[in-house]
């Protein structure tokens, strides 16, 4: 019997460096695909790709190379949910999750099912009675987010930032209560093989311009009429106060359980994005049901993965290990879709 060589592939952006490095650490050949301009990043400056395929999604070449594709935020954003759902290349994870993650109304239903603490959502902007954060649907790295303090402020900014002028165009926007607290982004991995949840790492985001605006005196901020934006520029590692760890772990467990009931399961990496309030409540405002860029500071592992593995273990490498174990146990079909 001829043994098929499986290669690990991902879109050349987001967390591809980490994913491909982790795959090589687990003994896989690797494939990056994307624009010609970034090819040197993955083959010269950081040589983690054995193959680089130019193109948005070169399906025939990926099939020929027996690739398993690892989804990232950039992958879904550039290709779109519909194309990803139709793709023939084996996809690590459950594709049914994509619809629930990319639609904020379905996402809300999922998080409510998990019994997580959530911010209030406003269906009608005229009901806004406290600061809110407005978010377009889908993974866009914080682009298009803005804060509004009342209905008038909302309508002024939603036209400015999103080009929306009436309520009929708000179906792809969610208006959330703005919860004051410390941003915390725990990264999880759920193994379909062992049925175990792992806390991989935690980060907080470095965003433009909200993380720079404090360097401008408040008087000047008012005179300049600056609008706060939340475009993600990078990520900062975070070690959480130990007494709070069970809060984020239990939230992750409930999220996995809810996914099993709603969409047939969530496996692989995911992230609950939220804040800890001054009362130490973990309030979750959204989920990323795939690897997040916040795992990139931990290419050599995190304090939490060292406690479990006692060896360098990034989220990218943990994905590759799950695939390797699935192949060894003849269960690859169980972890791809």
From Swiss-Prot:
Pathway: Purine metabolism; IMP biosynthesis via de novo pathway; 5-formamido-1-(5-phospho-D-ribosyl)imidazole-4-carboxamide from 5-amino-1-(5-phospho-D-ribosyl)imidazole-4-carboxamide (formate route): step 1/1. This is 5-formaminoimidazole-4-carboxamide-1-(beta)-D-ribofuranosyl 5'-monophosphate synthetase. ATP binds at residues 125-185, 207. Keywords: ATP-binding, Ligase, Magnesium, Manganese, Metal-binding, Nucleotide-binding, Purine biosynthesis. It is an enzyme of class 6 (ligase). Residues 81-328 form the ATP-grasp domain. Pfam families: DUF1246, DUF1297. Its EC number is 6.3.4.23. Mg(2+) binds at residues 273, 286. Binds 1 Mg(2+) or Mn(2+) ion per subunit. Its cofactor is Mg(2+); Mn(2+). NCBIfam families: PRK13278.1-3. GO terms for biological process: 'de novo' IMP biosynthetic process. It comes from the Archaea. It comes from Pyrococcus abyssi (strain GE5 / Orsay). Signal peptide: none annotated. 5-amino-1-(5-phospho-beta-D-ribosyl)imidazole-4-carboxamide binds at residues 14, 74, 235. It catalyses: 5-amino-1-(5-phospho-beta-D-ribosyl)imidazole-4-carboxamide + formate + ATP = 5-formamido-1-(5-phospho-D-ribosyl)imidazole-4-carboxamide + ADP + phosphate. GO terms for molecular function: ATP binding; ligase activity, forming carbon-nitrogen bonds; magnesium ion binding. Catalyzes the ATP- and formate-dependent formylation of 5-aminoimidazole-4-carboxamide-1-beta-d-ribofuranosyl 5'-monophosphate (AICAR) to 5-formaminoimidazole-4-carboxamide-1-beta-d-ribofuranosyl 5'-monophosphate (FAICAR) in the absence of folates.
């Amino acid at each position: 019997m001829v043994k098929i060589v499986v290669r690990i592939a991902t879109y050349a952006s987001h967390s591809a460096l980490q994913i491909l490095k982790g795959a090589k650490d687990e003994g896989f050949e690797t494939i990056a695909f994307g624009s010609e301009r970034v090819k040197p990043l993955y083959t010269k400056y950081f040589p983690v790709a054995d193959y680089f395929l130019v193109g948005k999604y070169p399906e025939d070449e990926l099939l020929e190379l027996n690739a398993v594709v690892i989804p990232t935020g950039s992958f879904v954003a550039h290709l779109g949910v519909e194309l990803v759902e139709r793709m023939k290349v084996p996809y690590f994870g459950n594709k049914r999750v994509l619809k629930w993650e990319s639609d904020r109304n379905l996402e809300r239903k999922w998080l409510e099912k998990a019994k997580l603490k959530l911010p209030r959502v406003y269906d009608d902007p005229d009901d806004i009675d406290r600061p809110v954060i407005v978010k377009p649907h889908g993974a866009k790295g914080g682009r298009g987010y803005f804060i509004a303090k009342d209905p008038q402020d909302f309508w002024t900014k939603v036209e400015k930032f999103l080009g929306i002028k009436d309520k009929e165009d708000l179906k792809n926007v969610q208006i959330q209560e703005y919860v004051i607290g410390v941003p915390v982004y725990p990264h999880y991995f759920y193994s379909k093989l062992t049925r175990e949840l792992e806390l991989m790492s935690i980060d907080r985001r470095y965003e433009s311009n909200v993380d720079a605006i404090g360097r401008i005196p408040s008087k000047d901020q008012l005179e300049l009429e600056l609008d706060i934006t939340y475009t993600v520029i990078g990520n900062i590692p975070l070690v959480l106060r130990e007494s709070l760890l069970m809060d984020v772990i239990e939230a992750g467990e409930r999220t996995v359980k809810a996914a099993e009931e709603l969409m047939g399961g969530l496996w692989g990496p995911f992230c609950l994005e939220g804040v800890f309030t001054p009362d130490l409540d973990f309030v979750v405002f959204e989920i990323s049901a795939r690897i997040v860029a916040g795992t990139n500071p931990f290419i050599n592992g995190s304090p939490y993965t060292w406690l479990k593995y006692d060896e360098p273990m990034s989220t990218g490498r943990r994905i590759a290990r799950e695939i390797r174990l699935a192949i060894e146990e003849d269960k690859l079909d169980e972890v791809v879709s």
